[in-house]
Curated annotation (Swiss-Prot):
Transmembrane segments: none
Pfam family, one: Orbi_NS3
Protein name: Non-structural protein NS3
Annotated source species: African horse sickness virus 5 (AHSV-5)
Gene coding for it: Segment-10
Function in brief: May play a role in the release of virions from infected cells.
Sequence similarity: Belongs to the orbivirus NS3 family.
Lineage of producing organism: Viruses, Riboviria, Orthornavirae, Duplornaviricota, Resentoviricetes
Length: 217
């Protein structure tokens, strides 16, 4: 059998081997920019990480640590909000910060005035109490004290009045201090939100923090 017959016989038994198979190129993975859903998921991951950082820190017994926790929460909220809402809250927060700082300055002036009042009332109360104490120790002072009825009434009246003012001013000062702490915490939250809303975001976990600040005032 010659070569031509062998080739013909092979092609008859293996006819399918000569069919043309269309070429399908292998798939290629092209690099693409992060989609909106990916970006949102990454922002939520960063927000969750910030909240975990706030919860894993110290108990926040002092005012500074409480302000820090409030700042962490505000930053997490800023990263979790959509972009339009974030910009709206940023503009509103900038305007609100001015009013809050004015209120804080007013409350600090009131507290300073109350401190002066407490100091004066305390001095008068101490002086009148010392006069009453000396009248018990010294018989001569006690005699003059009893002979001058108007002096006794004046000293007792001043002592009672200044003691009442001292107690009332102390309670008012404590309430003002609570309002000051609450206002400072609100300022810290809004400053942190505005700072977080101004951060640059390039789609990865590296962010450029533009002067994150809280509780300055």
């Amino acid at each position: 059998m010659n070569l031509a017959a062998i080739a013909k016989n092979y092609s008859m038994h293996n006819g399918e081997s000569g069919t043309i198979v269309p070429y399908v190129p292998p798939p290629y993975n092209f690099a693409s920019a992060p989609t909106f859903s990916q970006r949102t998921s990454q922002m939520e991951s960063v927000s969750l990480g910030i909240l975990n950082q706030a919860m894993s820190s110290t108990t926040g017994a002092s005012g500074a640590l409480k302000d820090e926790k409030a700042a962490f929460g505000a930053m997490a909220e800023a990263l979790r909000d959509p972009e339009p809402i974030r910009q709206i809250k940023k503009q509103v927060g900038i305007r609100t910060l001015k009013n809050l700082k004015m209120e804080l300055a007013t409350m600090r002036r009131k507290k300073s005035a109350l401190k002066i009042m407490i100091f004066i009332s305390g001095c008068v109360t101490l002086a009148t109490s010392m006069v009453g104490g000396l009248s018990i120790v010294d018989d001569e002072i006690l005699g003059d004290y009893k002979n001058n009825d108007w002096l006794m009434k004046t000293i007792h009246g001043l002592n009672l009045l200044c003691t009442t003012v001292l107690l009332a001013a102390g309670k008012i000062s404590d309430k003002i201090q609570e309002e000051i702490s609450r206002t400072k915490r609100d300022i810290a939250k809004r400053e942190s939100y505005v700072s977080a809303a101004s951060m640059s975001w390039n789609g990865d976990t590296e962010m450029s923090l533009q002067g994150i600040k809280y509780g300055e005032s």
